[in-house]
């Protein structure tokens, strides 16, 4: 279940979706290859799927009136959010004369945002189609044949993926008693701040108002449905450590 403030209803909304079925599967493979006695090559990749496999009937209540409503929610093929479903990594590990260097390049893709069930209610999809007919220059159609919804109408928002490079360099110095260790770690060496780490769709408020007579008016300049909330990776950052072993 979910709860959020629904601007269209001017009320907190509590949503329950029962009978929702999900599917999880994937493939992962890795390889470690010794190039020389002091250099290793590592690679790892995974591609997975974690999605809903059916549409459901949603039951929701408005806190302002305590009234309960039901509607069909078209949430089939909505993916799990907050984690990349495709990941790849290649790396080099060097160890020689007390030095060690670890360089990794990691790729992340298919990062989905948390979806909004209310944006995919049958009632809302019907209203969005009415908005398209009234303002085709602003809104997109939700159906082309009147029998089914278009793929774009129920598509889940995604985040931008990409590469992130991490570097670790260290040196171990032997002493008469114990050893001294130095380690410098730098994450996101290329300062790629375009990778999305998570977020959610902002669809609790439509870009229009439906009157009691079914007419569309009060079109808003800012369209929440086109501006999902996204979180991004930190830029380049690092840490330097000194340790003494005895």
Say what each PLM segment does:
Residues 106-133, 141-145, 160, 171-246:
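C-terminal beta-signal and adjacent terminal beta-strands/loops
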Residues 89-93, 167, 182-187:
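Conserved beta-strand->loop/alpha-helix structural units within folded catalytic cores of enzymes
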């Amino acid at each position: 279940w979910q709860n959020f403030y629904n601007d269209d209803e001017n009320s907190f909304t509590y949503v329950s979706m029962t009978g929702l079925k999900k599917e999880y599967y994937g493939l992962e493979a890795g390889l470690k290859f010794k190039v020389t006695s002091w250099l290793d090559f590592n690679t790892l990749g995974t591609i997975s799927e974690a999605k809903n496999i059916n549409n459901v009937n949603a039951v929701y209540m408005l806190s302002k009136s305590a009234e309960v409503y039901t509607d069909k929610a078209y949430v089939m093929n909505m993916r799990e959010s907050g984690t990349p479903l495709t990941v790849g990594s290649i790396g080099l590990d060097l160890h020689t004369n007390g030095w060690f260097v670890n360089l990794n390049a990691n790729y992340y893709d298919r990062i989905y945002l948390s979806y909004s069930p209310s944006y995919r209610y049958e009632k809302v999809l019907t209203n969005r189609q009415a908005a398209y007919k009234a303002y085709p220059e602003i809104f997109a159609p939700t159906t082309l044949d009147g029998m089914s919804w278009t793929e774009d109408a129920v598509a889940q928002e995604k985040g931008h993926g990409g590469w992130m490079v991490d570097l670790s360099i260290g040196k171990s110095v032997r002493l008469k008693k114990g050893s001294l260790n130095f380690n410098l770690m730098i994450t996101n060496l290329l300062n790629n701040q375009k990778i999305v780490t998570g977020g959610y769709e902002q669809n609790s408020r439509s870009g229009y108002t439906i009157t009691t007579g079914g007419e569309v008016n009060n079109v808003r300049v800012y369209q929440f449905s086109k501006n999902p909330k996204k979180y991004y990776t930190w830029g380049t950052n690092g840490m330097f450590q000194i340790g003494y072993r005895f």
